[in-house]
Amino acid sequence: MLELRPNCELCDTDLPPEAADARICSYECTFCAACVEDVLRDVCPNCGGGFQPRPIRPRTAWRDGTGLGHDPPSQRRRNTPYSGEEISAFVAGVRDVPVTER
């Protein structure tokens, strides 16, 4: 089950389940679109992968066993352990490699 993390791991802005600006990598690291575009340049600082829009989980259980009531978002806030300098250096070394070749 996709973990819906509650915040951007870089700037700590809230990203509720319905946030259209939430971005995730293949490991579910979660960042806001502004950080992905302006700071991270589509490079996850944790794994080096790229980002995609996070799916929005339906509020309503349209089918049994689905929806936010059945699979609620995480309450655990996460923050990247890397400094701004570490992130900048990492991004600079990875961003020119196509996502499909990382």
What are these regions (language model features)?
Residues M1-R102:
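Intrinsically disordered, low-complexity regulatory regions in eukaryotic proteins
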